[in-house]
Structure formats: C-alpha cells, structure tokens
A protein has these predicted regions:
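Accessory nucleic-acid engagement/destabilization modules that flank
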Residues: 2-272
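Walker A/P-loop
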Residues: 310-332
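Conserved Walker A/P-loop ATP-binding site and its immediately adjacent core
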Residues: 346-370, 379-385, 497-501
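Interdomain hinge/linker at the junction between the two RecA-like core domains of SF2 helicases
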Residues: 498-548
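Conserved strand-helix element at the start of the C-terminal RecA-like helicase core
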Residues: 348-362, 545-570, 580
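Conserved RecA-like helicase motor core of SF1/SF2 enzymes
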Residues: 93-97, 583-587, 591, 606-655, ...
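C-terminal accessory region of SF2 helicases/translocases
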Residues: 2, 8-9, 624, 638-641, ...
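Post-DEXD/H (motif II) to motif III coupling segment of the RecA-like Helicase ATP-binding lobe
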Residues: 451-464, 468-519
Length: 820
C-alpha cells in the first residue's frame, strides 16, 4: 500500500472523520500509553511492590521500566502491514504482529541498541518482555506468517517525532535518525534488513538464555507486575482517548489518578454492617437507626476474632450459618481503618465467590441495600455499562487467535476483548466489588479482564469465600497468588476444607492466622443423620414434615434427577409451594427463582418444598426442617447439611433435624463425581453414624479430616499453570499467553435462539450488550455439536431444534433448558 500521510495506531470511522482523530494517531497513542504507564507507576507502583514483598527501594527502577515498556509497546505499528490493516484492509495477513516488530527493533537494530543502552540491560529487557506480550500472543510458538515482506517506516516524520519524545521522557540522548525505511522479509533470498524467522529465532534464543537471571521468585514478580500494569495502561489509553477524541480534552494522568483515588472509608463499611444487623430485626423502616447497632445486638466471638487477626492472611473455618460474611466485613473494616491511618484512602474490597449465582445473592443481601452509594459498588459478572463505553481498536483480527480465519469468529473475539477491557477498567473506580473468584485469580492465568483489573486488585483487600468449591486449577491459582503477594491482605473462608489443601496453604504461607468457629455454635447438635434410606422412607418423611408446615430441601446430584423429583413432588403436593432450582435456567429466571425460594422458606407456618442441585450448597441462605440428599463428597454434604436447621443457636437450640442421605439410583451413575469421592463419602457417613448421637458442625469437620487425603498438593504443577508469574523454561517472563483459570467443565453457556430473535426485532444495531447477554444466558451440558453453533458476543446461540426451554414468564414455573 501507499505510505500514509500520518501513521495510525488505531482504526477510525472514516465516514465520521475527514481526518484521523487524535486517538487514532500513532504519535498520540504512544504518548497516551506512556503517560498512562507513568501515572499508574505513581499511583499503584509502590503498593504493588509492597504487596509482592519486594524492596521499596526498587520503585525508581520499576517506574522507569514501566515507562520504557509503554513507549516500546507500539513502536512496531509503524509498518506497512499494520498501516494497511487500520486503513481499511482489515483482512490483511501480517508477516509479524506489531509488538513483535517492536521487540525486533529494540533487541536487534544496532542504532536502537546503542541509543537504549543507558536504560541498563535489565530495564530494557523487562520493558521489551512487557511490550511484546501486551496482547498475550508471544511465546515459543510465535512464528512469522507466509506472506510478503513489510516495511518499517523508520524514516517517517511521525516515527522520528515519536522517538524524540521517547528520548525526552526517558532522559535519553537524541534518538537515531533513519534516512530510509527498514525491510523485514520472509525468505532468505529476499534483500532485507531483517529476515523474519531468523530474527525471531534469534531474540527467542537470547531470551531463553537470560531466563536464568530471573530464577528467583522476587525477580519474576517484578516482571509480572510490569507486564500487567503495562497492559492496563494500554487499555486506559485506548478507552480514554476514544471517549474524548481530541488530546486537548483529556489527561491520562488525571484519569488514572481520579479513578484509582476512589475508595471505601471505614464509615462506609460501618453502614453496611449496621444495615445488615438491622435487617435481622422485624422492624418498620422508621424504627431503623443506621447510626448504631440494634439494641442488644452483639457480634459473635468468632466474628470478633476474624476482625482481630493481624496477619496478612487469615483463614476462617466455621460451620454454615456461623456468620462468616459479616465477619469478613468486620475484617475489611479493620484493614480499611488501618490503611487509612497509613495514608491510603483508596481501598478496594473484592468479595470473591465461586459462582455467578453466589455472587448475585451476596451482592443483593449485603452490598445492594447497604446504604453505600451505588456508584461505589459493583456486581462484576453483570456489569458492562461504564463511562468509557467503547475502546479505540485497531482491527478485529488483532484480538483473534493467530490461526483463526473465520471473520464472524474474529469479530466476536474482538467484541469479547473490548468487553473484558471495559469491565476491567470499570473496577478501578469501584471500591466494593462482589465477583467470582476468576476476576482476581484469573490474573494467574493472564486472563484479560483480570489483567485490566490489576491496578484495582493491587489497592484492595480480598475475601475468598467458599474455597472448598474451587476446582484443582482455581485452588492452584489461589496458592500461587497467596505465595507471590505475601503482603496483600487476604481472608479465606469455608465450612470445611480437605486436609491436603489446608496443609498446602500453610506451606506457602506460614504466617497464616487460623480462626475457628465459635465452639458453642460448632458443637450445637443440629442433625439426625439417616443412611441409607429407601424411596418410600423419603416420601414418608416429606409427608410428615409438610403436615407440620415444615420446609423440605431435597438435593439431587443431577439436573434430570432434580426435575423428576420436582415433577413427582408437585403431583403429590399440589396445594403447597414446590420449586426446582438448578443451573439450567436463564440467569434472569434463576435470579427470580432464587428470591422466590428464599421468600417461601421465610414464611412461618407455611409448608414448602425445594428440589435443587449443587446450587443449594452455597447460594441459598435458608433453613430447612428436613434435608434429603443424594450421597455426595463430604464437602458437598457438609454444605447441604448447612442448610438444615440453620437458625439454631445456643440460646435457641431447638431439636435436631433429620438429614436423609440416599444411595444413587444405580451404582455406576456417579457423575459428576468420581467413584473414589463417593467411596470416601460412604466411609465418612459411617463414621458419623458410629457416633450414635445428634451431630454438630464440628463432628462433620472432624470426621472429614479423618478421611481426607493427606497426600501433598502438587504446588509445582500449579506454578506451571499460573503463567502470570511462570517458571523459567516453561511460562511467564518473556512468554505471555492466556492459560486456563478453571478445569474444563461439563456445561457451556448459550443464548436461546428465540431470545436472540426477540432482541433483533427491537431494531437495535450491533450486538446485545453484556447486561442482556448475562440475563439471557443459560448453561447446558456440552455436546460436540454445540461448538459449531453461531455466536453472538462470544456466546453460542442454541437452535430451537436443539434446546427446549420450559419456563412460564407469568407463573415463573418451569424446569428450564434441556437437549432435544
């Protein structure tokens, strides 16, 4: 293509603008990224180093490295292939990505090497590693494409001006002046300055040699923080510049400082805690006084002990219904007060739970009605409406996999990337964040949204609740996160944890402060366990409970079993409330069902039956009079039993309630669990039965410890998977690719074709926004054919002939989605 009159960094709407707006210009974007890096270093740098346990004297080196990274990131956009791509040829295949070209220039071009030498080899190297990885697409498997040669426009006035400004900002000598452009070619016979493949092999070989310099964890933490904040800076620069269009209308320094200066005050958390305390009283609104606790209200000893912990890592293990959530906010209040006295007024709280269902209900129960201004709180898995609205983009292929040739899929990948960036940046100015654990621990896998959230994460205290529910990948990421951020305040909570995992946490963090539940509550007799029981026994127990206006919770291991039991219960008891609750409901329907179930169980003197799956283990704050459950692994059964007789207290103990544990319909129908897990469960149940007495939470935990696997957790394997920090010769450092946050699941989220068609009839342009997607997505079991369905906003659309959806919008009854 013909060399453009002005070099571009971003594409723009040529119908709207006769000339490129500032945000699209090569010189302006590079300047914006550098300024954003400088501001992030100023605001977040010191606390990030402290969180990682790094020497505070490294701050000057850190700031300089991050700034150099910002200037280097997009140097390589001054090339013919990239300029063609952002000038309308969006389907062009590039010989090398622009960030790879940036790395080649800095590492191999002699004039660049001499000019940048005063930075120091270490600063330059880390800055380059951050730059070539800022799109998470560089590692051992990065190779040139088999296409024509490209020109690097080193003689262009914009390129020269950019180098001159870079020199001034980094306090370097006058930059080299290139009288002609450089050529990068694919073939050995080509006349060129650099052979693409050979040059790429050369820098990768050099990087491999230098990995040994970063063998210690502290060095790898330094590198990872530079890379993450560099990516976040690029996101901020793209978002702010796109919104304000002209450089005179915005300041990256102001944006970063203002957004990251918003934080919670101790008084905000006092309001949240008092609000929750008053909600426990049956009072009229005018009787509530949020300036104080209700008369006679006293926090439990366990809650006070969690608050009193002085360690950076606290582990609260207490039975279901012990008040762990409020203990967490008391703990956060203590840290908020402590950090405010140290001059930090921008504290964030991340309250992390395992699933979207648990986050939604926690958000409703604690944050939404807390009295804290709504602009200071966020439910991240459903939030998408933020001030930036859109990001300045290059072209859709920039975010797609290198091997992806499908235009629709590349467009969808670009939209998903934009959504992740916007949602990540939104958290900078949102101090109270209720979210899934992936939002934070995704950082360990280089997950895009987590990386863009890094500045907020570094300014936070973090609660990880229900950690027993983390799969092996997520728990491994938790361990790596805890080990590498030893001075970031973290609270872990659960009712039970396998001994293997507890020991693994203690090994990576010997400073762990363990807080057990209140002894009186933990030893309060709550359950009568029965195992095994037959079909008739269960229905007899249900009839007896219903006759006394009791509440029945029946938990099945599979959705189809739950639907069968629900149908049978509805037929047997047509005059009482019978509901089914599982993940096959659209998110908006599931949220309605959740609230309906909670309300039904709160009504005194009125019978109710809830049939549920594993969703009952964490997201339901209800108290049943009868529990019926399929045999399941001990942690799952402990959680299910936590919903039985939940309101019992030492002052008002009541009688222990029956828990009926049923054998599986067939011995081979163990899924979603393993035979080994269920064998352990049977041993655990027999040990409990052998006590020959009403059971308490401590009994459940003690006997679980006796049957837990004490084999040491494989931390080295977790470290390999946590590619954010990485280990030499495997991942991290100069390699930057996204990994997996969780193990592969059994379900996939889809949008129903009927819902998508209804959205299109509204005549809206583009694709549905994230809020609409979240409300309408539904999980279905994975089948190979689903992977071939068309997509919208990164979510597959389920054809009407493949998935049936049973739900009545008026009565709000139905069993949800199923394969046809």
């Amino acid at each position: 293509m013909k060399k453009p009159s002005q070099l571009l960094a971003k594409s723009y709407d040529r119908k709207k603008y006769q000339q490129p707006p500032d945000y699209a210009l090569y010189t302006q974007h590079n300047r914006d990224v550098a300024y954003s890096c400088k501001a992030l270093a100023q605001v977040v740098g010191a606390v990030a180093l402290a969180n990682a346990g790094l020497d505070e004297n490294l701050i000057a080196e850190f700031n300089r490295t991050l700034l150099a990274n910002g200037w280097i990131q997009d140097l390589g956009k001054a090339n013919s292939h990239f300029q063609a791509m952002v000038s309308g040829q969006s389907e062009i295949i590039q010989l090398l990505r622009h960030e790879t070209i940036s790395g080649l220039l800095v590492c191999l071009e002699p004039r660049f090497q001499e000019w940048l030498a005063p930075l120091g080899e270490k600063v330059k190297l880390i800055a380059v590693w951050g730059a070539i990885g800022h799109h998470r697409k560089f590692d051992d498997n990065t190779f040139p494409k088999k296409v024509m040669e490209l020109k690097v426009y080193t003689s262009d006035d914009d390129f020269k001006a950019n180098l001159k400004e870079m020199a001034q900002d980094l306090d370097l000598a006058e930059p080299p002046i290139f009288e002609s452009d450089l050529t990068i070619a694919p073939n050995k016979d080509d006349i060129c300055d650099f052979l693409a493949g050979e040059s790429l092999d050369k820098i990768k070989a050099e990087f491999r040699k230098l990995e040994s310099v970063f063998a210690d964890e502290q060095s790898r933490r330094f590198v990872a923080l530079v890379k993450a904040l560099g990516i976040a800076a690029d996101g901020a620069a793209s978002g702010v510049a796109k919104k304000y269009k002209l450089a005179e209308n915005y300041s990256l320094a102001d944006f970063v400082t203002e957004n990251l200066s918003k934080g919670l005050k101790p008084s905000d958390l006092t309001t949240l805690i008092y609000s929750w305390a008053w909600k426990s009283r049956d009072l009229k609104k005018e009787e509530i006084d949020l300036s104080k606790l209700p008369p006679g209200f006293v926090f439990r000893t366990f809650q006070e002990n969690v608050k009193a912990s002085e360690s950076y890592l606290t582990f609260a293990q207490a039975g279901c219904g012990s008040g762990k959530s409020i203990a967490a906010y008391l703990w956060a209040h203590k840290w908020c007060d402590k950090l405010e006295k140290q001059g930090r007024n921008n504290l964030h709280i991340f309250f992390c739970l395992p699933t979207t269902g648990t986050t939604t209900e926690h958000f409703k129960d604690y944050a939404l009605e807390s009295g804290i201004p709504p602009e200071l709180i966020s439910l991240t898995h459903s939030r998408s409406s933020v001030d930036l609205e859109t990001m300045a983009e290059t072209a859709i292929q920039e975010e797609a996999n290198e091997e992806e040739n499908d235009i629709a899929k590349t467009a969808s990948a670009a939209l998903k990337a934009q959504q992740d960036k916007i949602e990540g940046l939104a958290l900078w100015s949102t101090p109270l964040i209720v979210t899934t654990a992936d939002t934070v621990l995704g950082l360990m896998a280089n997950a895009r949204r987590a990386i863009y959230s890094t500045p907020a994460i570094m300014q936070s205290v973090i609660v990880f609740d229900e950690i027993h529910a983390f799969d092996d990948y997520l728990f491994g990421h938790l361990l790596v996160f805890l080990k590498n951020f030893p001075r970031l305040p973290v609270l872990l909570m659960t009712a039970s944890l396998p001994e293997q995992r507890r020991l693994a946490i203690e090994k990576v963090r010997p400073d762990l402060c363990y807080v057990p539940g209140d002894e009186k509550l933990e030893t309060l007799p709550r359950y009568h366990i029965q195992y095994p029981v037959n079909h008739q026994n269960t229905w007899d127990a249900v009839e007896k409970c219903i006759a006394n206006n009791g509440k029945v919770l029946w938990v099945r291991n599979r959705v189809e079993w739950a639907n069968e039991t629900y149908t049978e219960a509805k037929a047997k008891f047509p005059d009482i409330s019978v509901n089914v609750y599982h993940s096959r409901l659209r998110y908006k329907d599931r949220s309605d069902r959740h609230r309906q179930v909670i309300d039904d169980f709160k009504q005194k003197g009125k019978a109710a039956i809830l049939v549920a799956t594993q969703v009952a283990e964490m997201s339901l704050d209800l108290s049943a009079d009868l529990l019926i459950t399929d045999i399941a692994p001990p942690p799952a059964l402990i959680q299910r039993m936590g919903r039985l007789n939940r309101r019992a207290t030492p002052d008002n103990p009541g009688e222990p309630k029956p828990a009926l544990i049923c054998s599986l319909p067939a011995e081979n129908q163990v899924s979603p669990y393993s035979k080994e897990e269920l064998k352990t469960a049977k041993t655990w149940v027999e040990k409990l039965k052998a006590l020959n007495q009403p059971l308490n939470q401590k009994d459940l935990a003690d006997k679980f410890a006796e049957v837990s696997d004490v084999k040491e957790y494989d931390y080295k394997e977790a470290e390999k998977r946590a590619c954010f920090f990485g280990i030499p010769k495997n991942s991290g450092l100069w390699r930057t690719r996204p990994g997996s946050t969780r193990e592969q699941g059994y379900t996939i989220s889809v949008i129903l074709k009927a819902d998508y068609e209804a959205w299109k009839k509204q005549g809206l342009s583009g694709e549905p926004d994230a809020d609409w997607i979240r409300k309408h997505e539904v999980a279905v079991p994975i089948r190979q054919e689903a992977l071939k369905w068309e997509q919208v906003a990164g979510i597959r659309i389920a054809p009407n002939e493949a998935i049936a959806y049973n739900y009545n919008e008026q009565t709000r009854e139905g069993v949800g989605a199923r394969w046809l």
